[in-house]
Amino acid sequence: MDVNSNVDNPVIGLRSFGENPEAVSEKGIAYARGLENTGILSVSKHFPGHGDTSEDSHETLPVVRHNRARLDSVELLPFKRYIYDGFGGIMTGHLYVQLWIKVISRLLSPRR
């Protein structure tokens, strides 16, 4: 369910259903439905989205620097639709999402 929005991405490339979040959602869900109709559990990956990274996550930890609006409208959209359509298998990616680390740090801070 990765939206391939970075042409320099060394990992995703042709492993994505495209550059458009809507099209990736539709094709990914159709593929998942086809798998599950034959008794195979579908697993969507790489949550929360590995399509706009420039590093190979098998070699280093890519950093996702997008704000919440961008994450919601591009990277997370296919995963949201996948879950909404009743699918549940999701594999996380090896990614450092800056925004989430900031939020988690604030939530865990004793100075809240």
Predicted features, each with a name:
Residues 19-112:
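Second-shell residues forming the walls of enzyme active-site clefts
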Residues 11-13, 59-60:
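A generic short-segment signal for beta-strand/edge and adjacent turn/coil regions
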Residues 16:
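Active-site-proximal loop motif in hydrolases
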Residues 1-11:
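Short, conserved phosphate-binding/catalytic loop or strand-edge motifs used
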